Amino acid sequence: MAVEKVYQPYDEQVYNSIPKQQPQTKPEKKTVSRKVVVQLTKFEKVLYITLITVIAMLSIYMLSLKMDAYDTRGKIADLDYKIDKQSSENSALQSEIKKNSSYERIYEKAKKQGMSLENDNVKVVRSNGEAKN
């Protein structure tokens, strides 16, 4: 559904017959504004400079703390990696020790070197160094 706007035909005589009124002009008051520059006192200048300096020093100090924390975090990560690597090496060596210290392996090595097992010559040594027959 379309909407059409109907315009009245332009009639120049009707347009010219309407009296044109001149707008009444009122005398305008001119306002003059002056820019007034307010001077800061010495105390205010010193106060502002001190505040800006303190803020700058605090921001530098905070950045320094952030850098130190970042470096420390990196060192911690490096140490964690080294600890993990060393613990894996330790576990590998521990399993190798268990394998090499088994009774069968020791008995086999002794046989290869010409030794024999005689129960009379065997001494059981405890972990505190005492010998038991």
UniProtKB/Swiss-Prot annotation:
Segments in the Cytoplasmic topological domain:
1-45
Taken from the record, one Pfam family name reads DivIC
**Membrane-spanning residues where?**
46-65
Coiled coil ranges (UniProt) are: none
Q: What is its main location?
A: membrane
What's the protein's topology in the membrane? Answer: Single-pass type II membrane protein
Record family assignment: Belongs to the FtsL family.
- Tell me if Chaperone is a UniProt keyword of this record: no
- Quote the subcellular location field of this record: Cell membrane
What does this gene product do? Essential cell division protein.
Q: What UniProt keywords apply to this chain's record, in alphabetical order?
A: Cell cycle, Cell division, Cell membrane, Membrane, Transmembrane, Transmembrane helix
GO cellular component: a single term: plasma membrane
HAMAP family under this entry? Answer: FtsL
What's the protein here called? Cell division protein FtsL
